[in-house]
């Protein structure tokens, strides 16, 4: 589970991720949001987000609840809004690259509705996010000369497969890779 924040704008951050991340990150986003909405954090409900088959994501054991990215998402409504927008952007990016809807698309849009209903805030409040969590290797995590966005860019760049993982739309490959 990770978020890979490469830009303060959740849409731009999603657009520059490699194909591999665009495929797997929407599901991880749904899992994190289910925990954030549940009794582990906001206590809005344990079965608010449903999978494509209609069953809710399991929250009883609190998988991922102690992960730095989940904790970050639950730290403020602004962070939660950012993650929701990023998840929706990942879903849109998936459709752009693969020509079909991601299996988590409806759940991510459902998360946006849940957020509006329970927080009474506009989803655009993500603009007030002040920091981001980094979950990655120590060489990037403890480098005080760089910010979290740069740490994620360097982390992604360190993967030998990343530079060639823009097969669906090579124009999405960022200059920093």
Regions found by a protein language model. Name each.
Residues 1-66, 70-177:
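Sequence termini and other peripheral, non-core segments
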């Amino acid at each position: 589970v990770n978020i890979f924040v490469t830009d303060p704008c959740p849409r731009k951050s999603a657009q520059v991720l490699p194909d591999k991340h665009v495929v797997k990150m929407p599901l991880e986003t749904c899992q994190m949001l289910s925990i954030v909405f549940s009794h582990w954090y906001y206590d809005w409900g344990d079965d608010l987000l449903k999978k494509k088959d209609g069953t809710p994501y399991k929250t009883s054991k609190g998988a991922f609840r102690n992960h730095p990215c989940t904790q970050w998402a639950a730290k403020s409504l602004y962070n939660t809004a950012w993650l929701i927008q990023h998840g929706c952007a990942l879903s849109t990016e998936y459709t752009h690259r693969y020509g079909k809807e991601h299996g988590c698309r409806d759940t991510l849009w459902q998360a946006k509705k849940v957020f509006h209903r329970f927080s009474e805030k506009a989803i655009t409040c993500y603009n007030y996010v002040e920091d981001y969590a980094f979950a990655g290797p120590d060489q990037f995590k403890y480098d005080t000369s760089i910010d979290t966005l740069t740490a994620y860019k360097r982390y992604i760049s360190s993967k030998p497969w990343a530079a060639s993982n823009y097969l669906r739309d090579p124009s999405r490959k960022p200059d920093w890779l």
